[in-house]
């Protein structure tokens, strides 16, 4: 529908203009920043009008229609709370299988983690099609272009495609919590959950390897973090503990 096109395009106009405003701020280009912020505000107002005039509804089972405005932050407080609940209902109605497309699949786990980390793990652990774990369960060693991998007629789609591989960003940045915040600075904020017994990831920086691993224990979780030379890491654990550390190996 035309309103769907307007909604999708307007959402990404907001996203891109606000990203450009942030870049301009970092570069000290205040005139550009003000221009981008002004146009982003206008686009936000236009998106809000589409919702409030009910030209499109957030009472929907279409996961992308809920994920996109939640991720970009386009809804007011009341609408946001409703959209979160409606997204969980939409996933329940689809047996916790992915129903997002090319644009929203990279966003859905982050949106769910903001609601409750266990929702994100529940979706990640789905082994039915459409779902990430359906691929390795059926012999995949790469990310398929199509969820089913092989077509019903016997044809094979691309077996090496990025569109659904954006899940790796969530595995590194949320599950294992490795986030680069500067040339030699990191934020380490692992968020374990689901039925996983352990997870580990590493990032090869110009100063050496940043390594994070967590293991499930009888009493909770234990963490092992290795920070490379000449680097600093702000460690934030799920129980609220925070610590800024330099190079070295740490266990919590």
Regions found by a protein language model. Give the residues of each.
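Long, well-ordered core segments of solenoidal/helical folds
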Residues: 37-56, 76-96, 115-135
């Amino acid at each position: 529908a035309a309103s769907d096109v307007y909604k999708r395009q307007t959402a990404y106009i907001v996203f891109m203009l606000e990203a450009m405003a942030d870049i301009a701020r970092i570069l000290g280009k205040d005139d550009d920043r003000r221009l981008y912020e002004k146009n982003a505000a206008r686009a936000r107002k236009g998106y809000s009008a589409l919702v409030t005039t009910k030209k499109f509804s957030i009472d929907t089972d279409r996961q992308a229609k809920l994920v996109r405005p939640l991720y970009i932050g386009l809804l007011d407080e009341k609408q946001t709370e409703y959209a979160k609940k409606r997204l969980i209902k939409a996933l329940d109605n689809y047996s916790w299988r992915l129903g997002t497309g090319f644009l929203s699949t990279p966003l859905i786990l982050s949106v769910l983690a903001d609601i409750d980390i266990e929702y994100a793990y529940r979706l990640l652990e789905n082994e039915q099609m459409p779902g990430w774990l359906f691929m390795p369960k059926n012999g995949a060693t790469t990310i398929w272009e199509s969820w089913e991998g092989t077509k019903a007629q016997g044809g094979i789609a691309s077996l090496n495609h990025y569109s659904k591989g954006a899940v790796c960003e969530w595995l590194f940045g949320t599950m294992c919590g490795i986030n680069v915040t500067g040339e030699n600075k990191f934020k380490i904020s692992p968020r374990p959950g689901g039925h996983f017994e352990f997870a580990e990831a590493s990032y090869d920086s110009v100063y050496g390897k940043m390594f994070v691993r967590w293991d499930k224990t009888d009493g909770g979780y234990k963490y092992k973090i290795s920070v490379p030379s000449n680097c600093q890491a702000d460690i934030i654990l799920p129980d609220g503990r925070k610590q800024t550390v330099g190079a070295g190996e740490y266990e919590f």
